[in-house]
Amino acid sequence: MRIGHGYDVHRFCDGDFITLGGVRIPHKYGLLAHSDGDVLLHALSDALLGAAGLGDIGKHFPDTDPQFKGADSRVLLRHVVGIVQAKGWKVGNVDATIVAQAPKMSPHIETMRQRIAEDLQVELDQVNVKATTTEKLGFTGREEGIAVHAVALLLPA
């Protein structure tokens, strides 16, 4: 078995929604990114790649490559799952923590879990997503952006 950790951050920019866990969430800002800015799926992708010893999403989907401009992070995550499986691994479980002062995440977490489980080809109880604030401290507390920590357990296929 292997464990991987992923971390990602995106800065807020002009916009009226963010995408997290494949869910479009109305917000007073958007997220600045080369792809769709889904910081949750980016952190999960990094955790999976790290556990399999396959580098990170920047290696597989460089932000200098125009083919990934505006890319759907669910498509990228499914690709990551495919290369992890090709190396002889399957997902045991994943756990992620969204760090954001706003928007409120609780109304969206179950849908995020469902979409992630679908993309990872696992049962819903193998996916956990939670959210916390930093009590208005730091860049997330000042509502400058969102961060996500994620861990993944891989098992031999």
UniProtKB/Swiss-Prot annotation:
Key words, A-Z: Isoprene biosynthesis, Lyase, Metal-binding
HAMAP family reported for this sequence: IspF (MF_00107)
Gene Ontology biological process terms in this record: isopentenyl diphosphate biosynthetic process, methylerythritol 4-phosphate pathway; terpenoid biosynthetic process
CDD domains from the UniProt entry: MECDP_synthase (cd00554)
Alphabetized PROSITE patterns for the sequence: ISPF
UniProt cross-references to InterPro entries, sorted A to Z: MECDP_synthase, MECDP_synthase_CS, MECDP_synthase_sf
Protein task: Involved in the biosynthesis of isopentenyl diphosphate (IPP) and dimethylallyl diphosphate (DMAPP), two major building blocks of isoprenoid compounds. Catalyzes the conversion of 4-diphosphocytidyl-2-C-methyl-D-erythritol 2-phosphate (CDP-ME2P) to 2-C-methyl-D-erythritol 2,4-cyclodiphosphate (ME-CPP) with a corresponding release of cytidine 5-monophosphate (CMP).
SUPFAM superfamilies in UniProt: IpsF-like (SSF69765)
Subunit architecture: Homotrimer.
Assigned protein family: Belongs to the IspF family.
Superkingdom: Bacteria
Cofactor note: Binds 1 divalent metal cation per subunit.
Protein name: 2-C-methyl-D-erythritol 2,4-cyclodiphosphate synthase
Binding residue positions for 4-CDP-2-C-methyl-D-erythritol 2-phosphate: 8-10, 34-35, 56-58, 61-65, 132-135, 139, 142
Catalytic activity: 4-CDP-2-C-methyl-D-erythritol 2-phosphate = 2-C-methyl-D-erythritol 2,4-cyclic diphosphate + CMP
Pathway assigned to this chain's UniProt record: Isoprenoid biosynthesis; isopentenyl diphosphate biosynthesis via DXP pathway; isopentenyl diphosphate from 1-deoxy-D-xylulose 5-phosphate: step 4/6
Chain residues that bind a divalent metal cation: 8, 10, 42
EC number: 4.6.1.12
Pfam families named in the record: YgbB
Enzyme class name: lyase
